């Protein structure tokens, strides 16, 4: 459960991301594909080369979903219900992949905002991404 302090930390961190959210989403996806090659199996139709339009496009979708989640931290299940359905029933993404992407998002944010990436911010973002992952995998049961 996200505390009030966690929610404030997440909001502050995401505000720093600003207009680069889509770029960071794409970078996190590239990190995931390079670090965890099995994740590529869900994107057989994508050009996974560095800077590809498809990875950038999906990175923007990831970032938009996270921006939506940041704006609805008090109702993540409601805010992410359609996305949860999509990933569980249509795409059938292995739930572990959300954890892998979460890790890559943390690394990406830390690399771009090292001064702001304090232990408290890190912990709050980690809890937030875990909460989002839990909601996205809730329909698998």
From Swiss-Prot:
Phosphotyrosine modifications at: 24
Organism: Macrotus californicus (Californian leaf-nosed bat)
Gene Ontology, cellular component aspect: blood microparticle; haptoglobin-hemoglobin complex; hemoglobin complex
InterPro entries: Globin (IPR000971), Globin-like_sf (IPR009050), Globin/Proto (IPR012292), Hemoglobin_a-typ (IPR002338), Hemoglobin_oxygen_transport (IPR050056), Hemoglobin_pi (IPR002339)
In-chain residues carrying the UniProt-annotated modification Phosphothreonine: 108, 134, 137
Entry-annotated residues carrying N6-acetyllysine: 16
Keyword Flavoprotein: no
Tissues showing expression: Red blood cells.
Protein name: Hemoglobin subunit alpha
């Amino acid at each position: 459960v996200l505390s009030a302090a966690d929610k404030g930390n997440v909001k502050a961190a995401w505000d720093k991301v600003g207009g680069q959210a889509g770029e960071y989403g794409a970078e996190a996806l590239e990190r995931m594909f390079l670090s965890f090659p099995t994740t590529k199996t869900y994107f057989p139709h994508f050009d996974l080369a560095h800077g590809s339009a498809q990875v950038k496009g999906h990175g923007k979708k990831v970032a938009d979903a996270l921006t939506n989640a940041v704006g609805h931290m008090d109702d993540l299940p409601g805010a992410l219900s359609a996305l949860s359905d999509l990933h569980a029933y249509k795409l059938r993404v292995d739930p572990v992949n959300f954890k892998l992407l979460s890790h890559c998002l943390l690394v990406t944010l830390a690399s771009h905002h090292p001064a702001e990436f304090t232990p408290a911010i890190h912990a709050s973002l980690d809890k937030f991404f875990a909460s989002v992952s839990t909601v996205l995998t809730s329909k698998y049961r």
